[in-house]
């Protein structure tokens, strides 16, 4: 009986804080933070392939980070039609949804943030490349498709991937090198003995990373790829350099 009431309480909590609306036939779910003001920002959460937005919100559990920073969580229920390619149709639909939230809550347009897993990771990477001037930072887990050419001096990024997710792991690692060489700060974290699933460790790092990025803090340290060693920034070649924005991020990156 106690378990039943816990589940009911959880569902009520979700219903209180998440609303839904449709744009161009696509259902969007929006979680409103406990407090917000006209400078509140929006974090777009892209789910796995064809996930409905409410599943994404419940799986990613960014609630605490969102409330701390007064951030709106917006999740689209994209499905089919190569939706991860924003230039075809989904990009305009997302921009309409963002504008809808901004109008309803009186928000002054701010930088947008992206996070996604699997096909959602592709969305995060490709939507950023499509609208870089609007994006403050982006992150992806288990992503296998990235822009052909990284943007020069790009926004901060986080990429994580299981090492057993072999093809995506190789693609992600090499993209990380090129992104850094083009002037972007990128944190790269592989997970040994992990496949394509969205692990708890990957989500913990994503929560900590967005907490720091939304706080607009500077790195407290730098880590080197492969060796997993903390070194002075100048002693790490740029293509292997990981910015660690907080002690929590350093702890999770070294884990």
Question: Which residues are covered by each model-predicted region?
Answer:
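Gly/Ser-rich "nucleophile elbow"/oxyanion-hole loop immediately N-terminal to the catalytic nucleophile
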Residues: 34-39, 83-119
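Primarily recognizes the serine-hydrolase "nucleophile elbow" in alpha/beta-hydrolase
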Residues: 103-104, 110-154
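Short amphipathic alpha-helix adjacent to the substrate-entry channel of hydrolases
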Residues: 55-74
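Short beta-strand/loop motif that positions the catalytic acidic residue
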Residues: 158-161
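Conserved alpha/beta-hydrolase "acid-adjacent" motif
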Residues: 166-172
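Alpha/beta-hydrolase-fold serine-hydrolase catalytic core, especially in secreted/extracellular enzymes
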Residues: 181-185, 193-255
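Short beta-strand element of the alpha/beta-hydrolase
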Residues: 39-49
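N-terminal cap/lid segment of alpha/beta-hydrolase-fold proteins
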Residues: 17-36
């Amino acid at each position: 009986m106690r378990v039943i009431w816990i589940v009911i309480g959880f569902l009520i909590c979700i219903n209180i804080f998440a609303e839904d609306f449709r744009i161009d036939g696509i259902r969007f779910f929006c979680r409103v933070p406990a407090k917000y003001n006209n400078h509140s920002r929006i974090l777009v959460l892209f789910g796995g392939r064809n996930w409905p937005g409410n599943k994404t919100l419940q799986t990613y559990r960014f609630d605490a980070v969102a409330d701390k920073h007064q951030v709106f969580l917006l999740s689209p229920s994209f499905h089919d039609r190569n939706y991860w390619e924003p230039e075809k149709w989904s990009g305009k639909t997302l921009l309409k949804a963002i504008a809808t939230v901004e109008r309803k809550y009186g928000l002054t347009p701010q930088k947008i943030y992206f996070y996604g897993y699997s096909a959602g990771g592709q969305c995060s990477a490709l939507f950023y490349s499509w609208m870089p001037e609007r994006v403050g930072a982006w992150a992806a887990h288990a992503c296998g498709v990235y822009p052909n050419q990284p943007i020069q001096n790009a926004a901060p990024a986080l990429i994580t991937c299981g090492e057993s997710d072999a093809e995506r792991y190789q693609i992600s690692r090499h993209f990380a090198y090129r992104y850094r060489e083009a002037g972007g700060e990128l944190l790269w974290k592989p997970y040994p003995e992990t496949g394509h699933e969205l692990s708890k460790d990957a989500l913990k790092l994503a929560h900590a990373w967005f907490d720091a990025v939304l706080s607009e803090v500077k790195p407290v340290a730098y880590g080197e790829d492969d060796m997993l060693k903390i070194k002075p920034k100048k002693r790490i070649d740029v293509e292997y350099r990981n910015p660690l924005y907080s002690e929590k991020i350093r702890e999770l990156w070294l884990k």
